[in-house]
Amino acid sequence: ITEGQHLFQVRDLKEYFADIDSALAQMHADGIDTIALMGHSTGGLISAYYLSENPDSPVKALLLNSPFLDWNFNGFMRKVAIPAFGALGRLFPDLAISQGDGTGYQESLLKKHHGEWNYNQDWKLFHPQKVDASWTRAISSAQNKIKKGAGIRVPILLMHSDKSVDGDHWTPEFQHADAVLNVKDISRIGRKLGQDVTEDTIRGGLHDLVLSSPPVREQVYNYIFSWLRQKHIF
């Protein structure tokens, strides 16, 4: 993120495909021909969307860490509000939409609160920032296309926590659950992304599984490398 750039300003998630293409081209130039693509949350949605739209990609496997495959809202929000925001995103792409003011997940990560990590909070914000209506539209569009049939050809490792936790304010449960997405949605949609999907449910995992407590993230990495060996990726 550089000066002048605006967070959550995107019209179509395909805008990110060029970044993936550039990375793949550079790896090919470096003589790397065995590539596994990994994505977390929105990055997981983008990664799945990319492989759905680019079936001839050189990527050999897809690893998904709590992918953002659906909105974690109630029925009214999903069926009425989100489509309405999407329509507004076409007409008023820069319209600002609140994400609320909850900081429970951030507190579960940061060392100065209840976590064990220090990171650049200009990049990973502590207080949720408003998003553009166009961003909401772009997310929904990609999710809907994925739900209709992603048809991803490569093996997929789908990972998520065993439970979700709701609320704006931190409680001890935030240290052992996904505080961002509904893990049932991840499972329901993720299992249909392709013909070869391995689902691993991580007991006590956070939304970003590799930022979970040491015993949990050790389990995550063991799953990843075991699966890669099993699929003869590396």
Task: Describe each region flagged by the PLM.
Residues I152, L158-H160:
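Short beta-strand/loop motif that positions the catalytic acidic residue
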Residues D196-F234:
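Catalytic active-site module of serine/aspartate enzymes centered on a nucleophile-bearing elbow/loop
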Residues D162-T201:
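Conserved loop-alpha-helix segment in the C-terminal half of the alpha/beta-hydrolase fold
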Residues I1-V10, H207:
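Glycine-rich "HGGG/HGxG" loop immediately N-terminal to the catalytic nucleophile
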Residues T42, I46-V131:
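Alpha/beta-hydrolase-fold enzymes
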Residues D30-S41:
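Alpha/beta-hydrolase fold nucleophile elbow
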Residues H127-K148:
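Active-site nucleophile elbow and catalytic-triad environment of alpha/beta-hydrolase enzymes
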Residues F8-H28:
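Alpha/beta-hydrolase active-site loop
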